[in-house]
């Protein structure tokens, strides 16, 4: 109702509630009518230890499948700060993941600029290209820094807009010869950024060596987050170990 009257409503809740419980309403009322509603949801992916009832590990897959809906996954406080006015200015429905609590700053606050629909190369590297979003961009940068000492040169391409995907930038970076391409995401391996990138590469007949760092296709455990991130392979140390095993 507010959107039809010319307002720009922002709705916020936990990601499990804003996607699973509200899915039909978002699909049939907001997206089908292309209403200017912004849905900002906290605790995406594995960012809570409360178990499957609170872990929105499939939210990107659900939201990517809805026509007209733009999907955003910022990586830190600066990204969120810049993304909010950008999605407010965008005409149409948006789903944005939110990191909760004290969110670190990992981007360059002087040189970074969020642009809707654009991926950003945060660092170059000749050996590995990590394509990531959200929390996993944070971890990818940490892993790249740690691997410098071992002689591995790791590039990080941050993809804050999951839909529409910045196909041109991804194809350009994935076309660099000799680099291992790794997609890292805080989401189930099915239906998220990894499958979107894999489909893009296949449709454009690009066949780099390709790996995926993602959550498994299962209901995840409850527990302390550091333990769960190690268990499911998305902690910095787990990412470093995976990259070393692939190089």
Report the location of each language-model feature.
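Thiamine diphosphate
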Residues: 47-48, 99-247
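Conserved thiamine diphosphate
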Residues: 1-129, 200
């Amino acid at each position: 109702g507010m959107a039809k009257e010319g307002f720009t409503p922002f709705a916020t809740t936990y990601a499990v509630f804003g996607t699973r419980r509200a899915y039909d309403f978002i699909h049939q009322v907001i997206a089908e009518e292309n209403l200017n509603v912004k849905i900002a949801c906290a605790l995406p992916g594995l960012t809570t230890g409360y178990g499957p009832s609170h872990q929105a590990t499939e939210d990107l897959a659900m939201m990517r499948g809805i026509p007209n809906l733009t999907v955003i996954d910022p990586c830190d406080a600066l990204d969120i700060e810049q993304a909010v006015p950008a999605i407010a200015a965008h005409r149409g429905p948006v789903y944005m993941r939110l990191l909760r609590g004290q969110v670190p700053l990992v981007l360059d606050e002087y040189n970074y600029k969020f642009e809707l629909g654009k991926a950003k190369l945060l660092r170059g590297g000749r050996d590995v290209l990590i394509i990531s979003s959200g929390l996993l961009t944070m971890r990818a940068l940490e892993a790249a820094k740690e691997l410098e000492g071992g002689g591995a040169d790791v590039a990080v391409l941050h993809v804050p807009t999951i839909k529409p995907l910045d196909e041109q930038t991804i194809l350009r970076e994935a076309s660099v010869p000799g680099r291992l391409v790794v997609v890292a995401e805080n989401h189930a391996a099915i239906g998220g950024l990894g499958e979107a990138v894999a489909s893009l590469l296949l449709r454009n007949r690009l066949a780099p060596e390709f790996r995926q760092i993602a959550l498994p296709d299962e209901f995840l455990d409850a527990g302390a987050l550091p333990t769960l991130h190690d268990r499911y392979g998305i902690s910095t140390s787990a990412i470093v170990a995976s990259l070393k095993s692939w190089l």
